[in-house]
């Protein structure tokens, strides 16, 4: 016995809805999580560079030739140390490379790196907004496909 055309249309609609829901959850939401996680890592890097800038500015203001401090060796294990010359600093360039710079050079590097990281975070924010817009558009399409009405919000009195 053949299925009625209306029932086939309902089944086809149900399959489409399932495919769209799967695409939203498996692809778009996963991509959104990846973009937001990457942006969070960029924010962490930016915060570290800004913290380093503050330390360098304090060093320049203090004008001490020696610096007493504690260094974290890992796992919150700190040791006391003395930095005999504070006129130069080693800065992590990335990919495991470090460069010895004067404090002024380090500040210039930090400014450039901070602006690049800010541009990257802005780009990632824009990407996340595009993905959210795609999710919203697909959800609206699903709503229409399922024949759901968009109920207006009740006015708050």
UniProtKB/Swiss-Prot annotation:
Ubiquitous. Expressed in prostate epithelial cells. Expressed in mammary epithelial cells. Highest levels in the heart, skeletal muscle, pancreas, kidney, liver, adrenal gland, peripheral blood leukocytes, lymph node, prostate, and thyroid and the lowest levels in bladder and uterus. Overexpressed in a number of tumor tissues. Keywords: Activator, Apoptosis, Chaperone, Cytoplasm, Cytoskeleton, Nucleus, Repressor, Transcription, Transcription regulation, Ubl conjugation. It is found in: Cytoplasm; Nucleus; Cytoplasm, Cytoskeleton, Microtubule organizing center, Centrosome; Cytoplasm, Cytoskeleton, Spindle pole. Gene3D superfamilies: 1.10.287.370. The keyword Iron does not apply. GO terms for molecular function: beta-tubulin binding; chromatin binding; microtubule binding; transcription corepressor activity. GO terms for cellular component: centrosome; chromatin; cytoplasm; cytoskeleton; mediator complex; nucleoplasm; nucleus; protein folding chaperone complex. InterPro entries: Prefoldin, Prefoldin_subunit_alpha, UXT. Pfam families: Prefoldin (PF02996). GO terms for biological process: apoptotic process; centrosome cycle; microtubule cytoskeleton organization; mitochondrion transport along microtubule; negative regulation of transcription by RNA polymerase II; protein stabilization. Its main location: cytoplasm. The keyword Translocase does not apply. It comes from the Eukaryota. Belongs to the UXT family. Homohexamer. Component of the PAQosome complex which is responsible for the biogenesis of several protein complexes and which consists of R2TP complex members RUVBL1, RUVBL2, RPAP3 and PIH1D1, URI complex members PFDN2, PFDN6, PDRG1, UXT and URI1 as well as ASDURF, POLR2E and DNAAF10/WDR92. Interacts with LRPPRC. Interacts with androgen receptor AR (via N-terminus). Interacts with estrogen receptor ESR1; the interaction relocalizes ESR1 from the nucleus to the cytoplasm. Involved in gene transcription regulation. Acts in concert with the corepressor URI1 to regulate androgen receptor AR-mediated transcription. Together with URI1, associates with chromatin to the NKX3-1 promoter region. Negatively regulates the transcriptional activity of the estrogen receptor ESR1 by inducing its translocation into the cytoplasm. May act as nuclear chaperone that facilitates the formation of the NF-kappa-B enhanceosome and thus positively regulates NF-kappa-B transcription activity. This is Protein UXT.
């Amino acid at each position: 016995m053949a299925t009625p055309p209306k029932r086939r249309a309902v089944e086809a609609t149900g399959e489409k809805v399932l495919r769209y829901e799967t695409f939203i959850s498996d692809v778009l939401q996963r991509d959104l999580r990846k973009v937001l996680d990457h942006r969070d890592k960029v924010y962490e890097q930016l915060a570290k560079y800004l913290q380093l800038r503050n330390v360098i500015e304090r060093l320049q203001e203090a004008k001490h030739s020696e610096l007493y401090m504690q260094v974290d060796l890992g796992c919150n294990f700190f040791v006391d140390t003395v930095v005999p010359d504070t006129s130069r600093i080693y800065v992590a360039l990335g990919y495991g490379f470090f460069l010895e710079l004067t404090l002024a050079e380090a500040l210039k590097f930090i400014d450039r790196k901070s602006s690049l990281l800010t541009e990257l975070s802005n780009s990632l924010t824009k990407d996340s907004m595009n993905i959210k817009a795609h999710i919203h558009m697909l959800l609206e399409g699903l709503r229409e496909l399922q024949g759901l009405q968009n109920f207006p919000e009740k006015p708050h009195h």
